[in-house]
């Protein structure tokens, strides 16, 4: 499992999530967080 700050799920394709399912939630209007799960 990998958790990281991302501006969007699409951008995270270049990060740790690229082989996993990316679930995003929005702690603030200006930020998104991705949690990558197997």
UniProtKB/Swiss-Prot annotation:
It comes from the Eukaryota. Expressed by the venom gland. Disulfide bonds join 2-17, 9-22, 16-36, 24-34. Belongs to the neurotoxin 02 (plectoxin) family. 09 subfamily. The presence of a 'disulfide through disulfide knot' structurally defines this protein as a knottin. It comes from Phoneutria keyserlingi (Brazilian wandering spider). It is found in: Secreted. Keywords: Disulfide bond, Knottin, Secreted. This is U9-ctenitoxin-Pk1a.
